[in-house]
A protein has these predicted regions:
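Conserved donor NDP-sugar-binding/catalytic core segment of glycosyltransferases
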Residues: 102-131
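Cell-envelope/extracellular polymer assembly enzymes that use nucleotide-activated donors
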Residues: 6-8, 36, 183
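Conserved short acidic donor-positioning loop in nucleotide-sugar-dependent glycosyltransferases
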Residues: 27, 42-43, 70
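Short aromatic/hydrophobic "clamp" motif used to bind/position activated sugar donors
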Residues: 88
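Conserved nucleotide-sugar donor-binding catalytic segment
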Residues: 143-216
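Glycine-rich, basic loop-to-helix element that forms the pyrophosphate-binding segment
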Residues: 67-83
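A conserved acidic beta->alpha catalytic loop
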Residues: 41-50
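Short, well-formed alpha-helical segments that are part of the catalytic scaffolds
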Residues: 16-29
Length: 237
């Protein structure tokens, strides 16, 4: 599969100067010449754009596009929409990919004949040596299916890769849903069959004060409302 498959990395960024360099280094070393990193910047005001431009001067596999200025979900959707690869890997601006992540995930696509893979990760603080959870799956749980994931979502975008055939189902991502990764996971299970959860950590998932996304909690009434709205949007696809 790797000889013919093209990998696209879809990354949404916003004011990511602190960790972006390390993340891009960890990604690019794993990619082949025909692969690409599509970065959608949502109006960064720090040195994020300068960092990306420096990388682009040395590496033509990086493409920078202007984000829609409509928040993280639509910024991610914008990056996905501009990808050209056979397999799309989602990437946050502040994590670090472990060596062999791309190779291992592509192996799973080949072995399982699936359309979406979610792998485990190690949750850290701002410093990667600060281990918060040695296994996100052990902390959160894991497994495919609507019943298992509607209340407590186990799909985690930064650990997700999917086949390009899912894109017409995924896009556009509704503005009023809460989680883009849950949206993608459910649509795969609905239209392409069960997602594969790989209990191998292939990423350092960094949690810090500047995180764009978080583990945030809502009140039960808000959660119920969000889930009902989410299901309505799902059934429309």
């Amino acid at each position: 599969m790797r000889n013919s498959a093209r990998v696209s990395v879809a990354m949404a960024v916003y004011n990511g100067e602190k960790y972006l360099h390390q993340q891009l280094d960890s990604i690019l070393v794993q990619l082949k010449g025909k692969d690409e990193v599509v970065i959608s910047d949502d109006g960064s005001t720090d040195s994020t754009l300068a960092i990306i431009q420096t990388f682009m001067e040395k590496d033509p596999r990086i493409r920078l596009i202007r984000g829609p200025g409509a928040g993280i979900k639509q910024n991610i959707a914008n990056a996905i929409a501009h990808t050209a690869g056979d397999f799309i890997f989602l990437a946050d601006q502040d994590d670090v990919w472990m060596s062999g992540k791309v190779r291992r995930v592509l192996e799973i696509f080949r072995e399982k004949h699936c359309h979406l893979v979610v792998h485990d990760c190690i949750v850290t603080g701002a410093e990667l040596s600060e281990i918060i959870y040695p296994s996100y799956f052990d902390y959160r749980g894991y497994g495919a299916g609507m019943v298992r994931n509607i209340w407590k979502n186990k799909y985690i975008g930064c650990c997700m890769a999917f086949h390009k055939s899912l894109v017409p189902y995924i896009l556009p991502i509704p503005d009023d849903i809460q989680m883009h990764d849950q949206w993608i996971g459910f649509l795969n299970d609905k239209h392409r069959g069960g997602s594969v959860f790989l209990k191998e950590p292939l990423l350092y998932y960094r949690r810090h004060d500047e995180c764009v996304s978080d583990f945030g909690t809502n009140t039960v009434p808000v959660m119920i409302k969000n889930r009902l709205l989410f299901l309505c949007r799902q059934f429309s696809r």
